[in-house]
Amino acid sequence: MIGVCVFNVETILNVYNAMQNKGPVTAKYITIAGEVKNPITLKAPLGITYAELIEMAGGTTVSDYALIAGGPMTGRICQPFDTVTKTSNAVLVLPRNHNMITRRTVKVTIDMKRAMAACCQCQMCTDLCPRHLL
């Protein structure tokens, strides 16, 4: 056992506000990034749609787009009219033909065949490495 607790800043802020104001969490800080005119992080009320958040970021810069809720590595594909929940943290707007979108929409049988190989030469690790090590 390590004996360490890890909290993100928003969680600590929510605990503080709950203790001081005795109120529930009614908003989340959300980052809207990718193919939008003005990538932003803003405080959004729970229940607002991703489409409304995209409009707050100036709209998309591509006509045919897909959304990923969460980060590029562990996020999931979502729809524009899905809503912000207490676990939301980011929305990535990407062209529908982007590698991160096509990778998440591939059939399970194809993905299983790729998993049998050590490397499928997709370059995903190289593209997403934050330190450009690969």
Which ranges hold each PLM region?
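Active-site lining segments that contact anionic ligands and/or coordinate catalytic metals
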Residues: 27-29, 39, 64, 88, ...
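Non-heme iron-sulfur electron-transfer modules
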Residues: 84-101, 133-134
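Short acidic beta-strand-loop surface patches of small beta-rich interaction domains
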Residues: 65-84
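Hydrophobic alpha-helical positions that pack around
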Residues: 1-48, 56-63, 71
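Ferredoxin-like iron-sulfur electron-transfer modules
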Residues: 101-123
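Short acidic, glycine/serine/threonine-rich loops at helix termini
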Residues: 42-44, 56, 78-82, 103-104
